[in-house]
Structures are given as C-alpha cells and as structure tokens.
Amino acid sequence: MSEVNVPLSFSDAAASRVKALIAEEENPALKLRVYITGGGCSGFQYGFTFDENVNDGDTTIENSGVTLVVDPMSLQYLIGGIVDYTEGLEGARFFVNNPNATTTCGCGASFSV
C-alpha cells in the first residue's frame, strides 16, 4: 500500500456519498475502489466497488475520513483525473473526469486513450 501525493483527486461530493454509503452498510472498514477494465463502446470502462482490502501496490487517496483505492494498472489511466459524484436527471452515479481520455461514450462510462 502506498499513500503518496498522486495527481488524482477524490472530490468532496464523492467522499460525502461514500461516507453515507459506508454508514448505511455499518462497516467502517469499507473503501471505494475505482478500477479500469477493457470493454464498453470506447475500449475501456470505469468500475467502482466497495472493498475492505488495500493490496500491495495500491494507491490510497483520503478525503473527509474515507478512502479511495486504486490499483497500479488502473492508476496509469487515471493520472490527473477527478473521481466525483453527481445526482441529476440521468440518476446518481460516481464518475471520473479524466483528462487522459481522447474519446468517451455518451454516458461517460467508457473511454479510449
């Protein structure tokens, strides 16, 4: 596990929502893990899950007492990005504002570099 100053941000809105979800689950050990997988209409897609573990090589980013976890493979695609949360007409969701993405799909769930 490394806790370094990486150019990846974890917004206050995302941290607040994670904190609320962790409280609902009544498990303070949970952390939000963001990861990249192959797929989606643009080649890569973002995934979000709750995880109790921090693996060797993972990077952690903290905000408001909650932790975002990123594996080293995914981190290379997320450098300079912002993990955020929004609620709107399209529903509520976590998303990544990713400056590395050269194209994104209409919903923002997948991208290419």
Swiss-Prot record:
This is Iron-sulfur cluster insertion protein ErpA. NCBIfam families: iron-sulfur cluster assembly accessory protein, PRK13623.1. GO terms for biological process: iron-sulfur cluster assembly. Belongs to the HesB/IscA family. GO terms for molecular function: 2 iron, 2 sulfur cluster binding; 4 iron, 4 sulfur cluster binding; iron ion binding. Pfam families: Fe-S_biosyn (PF01521). Homodimer. Required for insertion of 4Fe-4S clusters for at least IspG. The keyword Iron-sulfur applies. GO terms for cellular component: cytosol. InterPro entries: FeS_biogenesis (IPR000361), FeS_cluster_insertion (IPR016092), FeS_cluster_insertion_CS (IPR017870), FeS_cluster_insertion_RrpA (IPR023063), HesB-like_dom_sf (IPR035903). Disulfide bonds: none annotated. SUPFAM superfamilies: HesB-like domain. Transmembrane segments: none annotated. Keywords: Iron, Iron-sulfur, Metal-binding. Iron-sulfur cluster binds at residues 41, 105, 107. It comes from Vibrio parahaemolyticus serotype O3:K6 (strain RIMD 2210633). Its cofactor is iron-sulfur cluster.
